[in-house]
């Protein structure tokens, strides 16, 4: 992946940054692509760093993700709740599956999407192989995770758990405006809010 560099001029001279490091200076984190352990570790580290820099200033988490590994997403979610700063979530492009879950987990009143964003929720995906007992163990675990996800989504959207369970039985796609009406986000952004 090509990563652009920017030059910043100051009284002490010029300094070169990769674009993500430059955005981090403005408390912006980019969550882009499939969510897996390596990406989650990077997001968690950035959240913790920004909290250490200033625990009173908001952090802006931009999301463009098709989803990914549940436990990786939970590590980001738990860190968002663990740190003191509010985490504002902004969907750019798409927030599907775990991406949509994390979008909904931003600070209340600070969950956004750009007008042409696509948001999708569904039940956890999984597969199991092995002996019947192993498959049964995996099935119980995925049902447990489904319950946790549905409970958190219900809390975040102020929908009933039964509605979340019904809507996530299959892929449930929404426009930015529909996601606002559903309660996944608080506002559709036409212009930058910073």
UniProtKB/Swiss-Prot annotation:
Alphabetical UniProt keywords: Cytoplasm, Hydrolase, Protease, Serine protease
Similarity field: Belongs to the peptidase S14 family.
Gene: clpP
Active site positions, chain numbering: 97 (nucleophile), 122
Subcellular locations according to the entry: Cytoplasm
Protein source organism: Campylobacter jejuni subsp. jejuni serotype O:2 (strain ATCC 700819 / NCTC 11168)
Keyword hit for Oxidoreductase: no
Lineage: Bacteria, Pseudomonadati, Campylobacterota, Epsilonproteobacteria, Campylobacterales
EC number in record: 3.4.21.92
Gene Ontology terms, MF aspect: ATP-dependent peptidase activity; ATPase binding; serine-type endopeptidase activity
Function: Cleaves peptides in various proteins in a process that requires ATP hydrolysis. Has a chymotrypsin-like activity. Plays a major role in the degradation of misfolded proteins.
Binding partners and assembly: Fourteen ClpP subunits assemble into 2 heptameric rings which stack back to back to give a disk-like structure with a central cavity, resembling the structure of eukaryotic proteasomes.
PROSITE patterns tied to this protein: CLP_PROTEASE_HIS, CLP_PROTEASE_SER
Catalytic activity line of the entry: Hydrolysis of proteins to small peptides in the presence of ATP and magnesium. alpha-casein is the usual test substrate. In the absence of ATP, only oligopeptides shorter than five residues are hydrolyzed (such as succinyl-Leu-Tyr-|-NHMec, and Leu-Tyr-Leu-|-Tyr-Trp, in which cleavage of the -Tyr-|-Leu- and -Tyr-|-Trp bonds also occurs)
A GO-annotated cellular component: endopeptidase Clp complex
UniProt protein name: ATP-dependent Clp protease proteolytic subunit
GO BP field: protein quality control for misfolded or incompletely synthesized proteins
Enzyme class of the recorded protein, top EC level: hydrolase
UniProt entry tagged with the keyword Cytoplasm: yes
């Amino acid at each position: 992946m090509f990563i652009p560099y920017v030059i910043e001029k100051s009284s002490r001279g010029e300094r070169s940054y990769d674009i993500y490091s430059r955005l981090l200076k403005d408390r912006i984190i980019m969550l882009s692509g499939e969510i897996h352990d390596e990406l989650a570790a990077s997001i968690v580290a950035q959240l913790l760093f920004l909290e250490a820099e200033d625990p009173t200033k908001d952090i802006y988490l931009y999301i463009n993700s098709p989803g990914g590994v549940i436990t990786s997403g939970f590590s980001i979610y738990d860190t968002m709740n663990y740190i003191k700063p509010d985490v504002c979530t902004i969907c750019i492009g798409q927030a599907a599956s775990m991406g949509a879950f994390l979008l909904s987990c931003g600070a209340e009143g600070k969950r956004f999407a750009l007008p042409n964003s696509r948001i999708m929720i569904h039940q956890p995906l999984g597969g199991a192989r092995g002996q019947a007992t192993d498959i049964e163990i995996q099935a119980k675990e995925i049902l447990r995770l489904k319950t946790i996800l549905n409970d958190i989504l219900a809390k975040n959207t102020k929908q009933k758990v039964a509605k979340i369970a019904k809507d996530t039985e299959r892929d449930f796609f929404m426009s930015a405006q529909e996601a606002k009406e559903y309660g996944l986000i608080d506002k559709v952004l036409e212009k930058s809010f910073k």
